């Protein structure tokens, strides 16, 4: 009986903490004239976890998002993750428009290429990033067939919200795979093909800047 009461007390405390956190966030956003953020669905997060094997770190986490992602580690509130190194298998889902998402994407790619992280899944609702950041095409990318209904936190839990923008999911597979390892790119394809089209061309993995240099040299006529 005491254990049950203790558990109920913890659940009530956790709910109140979530409500306080959400109210604080709402107040900050209201002061800046912004809306409450939307969060990725558990279905996407679990697919990413299955592909990577774990979610060791979420640099874009906040107290609400951590309820959904349940990453092994999240940054403390005073840490600017754009200036710190990350680790392990990383889930990245930045909030905001193209400018903010491109900052997070560039940071993710930099951490990945320099070996600080093993792999990543990057979820973004700024679909304009497909044009603004050509580096995306160096990696497997899933473009959902339908706009993903994301979640907004309320005092009574999460509510599903129909978005006004398209989404994308980008995958950075482990760079140190051996012949005995599972083909992670195929796993990503199999896990997300029921969500959208997975695109990965034969030149993916090359640095897109090489093609840009080639263009500057040749200036193909159109």
Placement of each model-derived feature along the sequence:
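Class I S-adenosyl-L-methionine-dependent methyltransferase catalytic core
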Residues: 2-222
